[in-house]
């Protein structure tokens, strides 16, 4: 007999190519490409590794590429590695102490830069991205960035790789069937933004018990002023403060020190007068790194140490910060990290970026191997003391909890600005319910109650009661602080009320129990 052909494999190369192309197109249109500063130098038309993973993961989940299966973040990282090997994008050449260094392995990090190959990339002079991968505005009038030496890749043709597309997608356990969801979600950007916000709030309510919801659902603080840059205001080119900012950038590029680079990055958020003071102060310093660092650190402390400085974690979600600190006190670090990630998704992009830069600087400056910042306390405590008021609203929060929260954010600053996988899943389920025409207000994701029949309710009550009584009897029996007389009295009372459980607990030892 002849074995019939596997009809499920028919057309698989086409489906795999289609999925692959959609992932690439989505990454190119959704990831934030702009001029970035890294290791003392500015690189044009780049995107962050962590943001690429966010975009790819969101596309995989929302498009149901893997069906309803949970997609861990490491699979999106693996797919980004395959995209880099396929020459869709490359790691940006960075100079570390004068030597060219190119990453051979894709890194899910906010410090790793990548650049698309053979793609018209808008400059960031007119671009602004809010969120990570789902709210993007771009200017298409900028000159394109092209790489002439790489011509193997094209959006309209299969990618030439050492591995077949089927192997790449198969290793990720992806479903290669084209679905209507993958073709076109048909949803407006406004609706998408609202869905992301709703599901972010929903997930926060699952992690943290909030006494009041009005501030979270309705309260919005006015966004902070934009960065001081020629991109947002061309007239700045003719001001002295703009020249001072450019002097600081040039100074940073000339120094082989990540501490100085992180400090100068924070200067972009400072008012003009402080920037002018820093620029002129550097000119008066001797050519010693320690003097440069003392000057930059002092100016940052002066700016962020103001008593009336508005904290970067917005006050209208103070209850979230209080809840996160409680999670940390109880040792629930994973839930605390996810709660902070969700909280940051509710903030404006400007505050989020300023906080990211400040935490990066604090982590570098807080190292014991860096320049001593305070005569009596270690660097880690010095930066915590100097910048805590600029991060979280500490008037109503106990000082110990504020310190714990700030130090935790310093330690986790690399992961703090990533999108949790659970949020991706909630958004995916919500989109699926809308596309299928089911109730859009139906709660998706994890639920904590279900309808029980009368019989199930009785069985649950009996089981729970038995378990609690067993625990109570065990506590009485094993409590070494009770006197023998008191223990006999309590055991006697328990035996009179629940003899069956008493006999089951002691078994053959019941003859040795004096009650």
UniProtKB/Swiss-Prot annotation:
Q: Which InterPro entries match?
A: DEP_dom (IPR000591), WH-like_DNA-bd_sf (IPR036388), WH_DNA-bd_sf (IPR036390)
Q: Which Gene3D superfamilies match?
A: Winged helix-like DNA-binding domain superfamily/Winged helix DNA-binding domain
Give GO terms for biological process: intracellular signal transduction
The ranges of region (Disordered) come to: 121-160
Pfam families per UniProt: DEP
**What highest taxon heads this organism's lineage?**
Eukaryota
Q: Which SUPFAM superfamilies match?
A: Winged helix' DNA-binding domain
Extent of Polar residues compositional bias: 121-144
DEP domain residues: 27-118
Q: Which PROSITE patterns match?
A: DEP
Homology family: Belongs to the DEPDC7 family.
> What is the protein's given name?
DEP domain-containing protein 7
> What organism does the record attribute this protein to?
Danio rerio (Zebrafish)
């Amino acid at each position: 007999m002849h074995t019939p052909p596997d009809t499920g494999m028919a057309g698989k190369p086409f489906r795999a190519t289609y999925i692959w192309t959609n992932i690439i197109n989505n990454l190119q249109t959704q990831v934030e490409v702009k001029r970035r500063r890294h290791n003392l130098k500015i690189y044009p038309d780049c995107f962050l590794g962590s943001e690429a993973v966010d975009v790819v993961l969101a596309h995989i989940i929302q498009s149901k590429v893997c069906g309803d299966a949970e997609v861990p973040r490491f699979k999106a990282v693996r797919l980004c590695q395959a995209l880099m090997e396929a020459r869709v994008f490359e790691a940006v050449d960075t100079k570390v102490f004068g030597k060219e260094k190119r990453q051979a392995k894709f890194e899910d990090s906010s410090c790793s830069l990548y650049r698309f190959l053979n793609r018209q990339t808008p400059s960031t002079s007119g671009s602004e991205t809010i969120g990570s991968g789902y709210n993007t505005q771009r200017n298409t009038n900028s000159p394109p960035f092209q790489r002439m030496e790489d011509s193997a890749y094209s959006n309209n043709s299969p990618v030439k790789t050492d591995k077949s597309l089927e192997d790449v997608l198969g290793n990720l356990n992806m479903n290669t069937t084209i679905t209507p969801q993958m073709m076109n979600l048909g949803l407006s950007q406004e609706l998408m933004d609202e869905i992301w916000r709703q599901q972010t709030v929903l997930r926060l309510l699952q992690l943290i018990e909030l006494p009041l919801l009005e501030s979270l659902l309705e309260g919005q603080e006015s966004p902070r002023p934009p960065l001081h840059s020629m991109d947002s205001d061309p007239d700045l080119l003719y001001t002295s403060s703009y020249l001072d900012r450019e002097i600081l950038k040039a100074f940073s590029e000339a120094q082989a020190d990540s501490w100085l680079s992180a400090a100068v990055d924070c200067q972009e958020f400072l008012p003009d007068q402080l920037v002018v003071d820093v620029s002129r102060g550097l000119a008066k310093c001797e050519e010693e790194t320690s003097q440069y660092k003392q000057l930059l650190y002092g100016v940052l402390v002066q700016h962020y140490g103001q008593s009336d400085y508005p904290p970067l974690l917005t006050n209208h979600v103070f209850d979230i910060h209080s809840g996160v600190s409680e999670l940390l006190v109880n040792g629930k670090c994973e839930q605390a990290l996810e709660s902070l990630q969700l909280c940051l998704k509710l903030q404006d992009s400007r505050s989020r970026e300023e906080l990211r830069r400040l935490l990066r600087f604090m982590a570098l400056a807080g190292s014991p191997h860096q320049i001593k910042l305070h005569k009596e306390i270690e660097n880690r405590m010095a930066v915590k003391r100097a910048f805590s008021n600029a991060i979280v609203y500490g008037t109503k929060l106990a000082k110990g909890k504020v310190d714990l929260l700030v130090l935790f954010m310093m330690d986790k600053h690399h992961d703090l600005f990533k999108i949790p996988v659970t949020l991706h899943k909630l958004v995916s389920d919500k989109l699926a319910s809308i596309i299928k025409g089911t109730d859009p207000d139906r709660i998706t994701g994890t639920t904590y109650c279900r309808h029980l029949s009368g019989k199930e309710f009785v069985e649950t009550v009996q089981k729970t009661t038995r378990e609690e009584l067993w625990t109570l009897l065990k506590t009485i029996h094993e409590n070494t602080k009770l006197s023998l007389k008191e223990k006999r009295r309590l055991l006697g009372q328990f035996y009179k009320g629940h003899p069956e459980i008493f006999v089951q607990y002691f078994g053959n030892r019941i003859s040795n129990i004096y009650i």
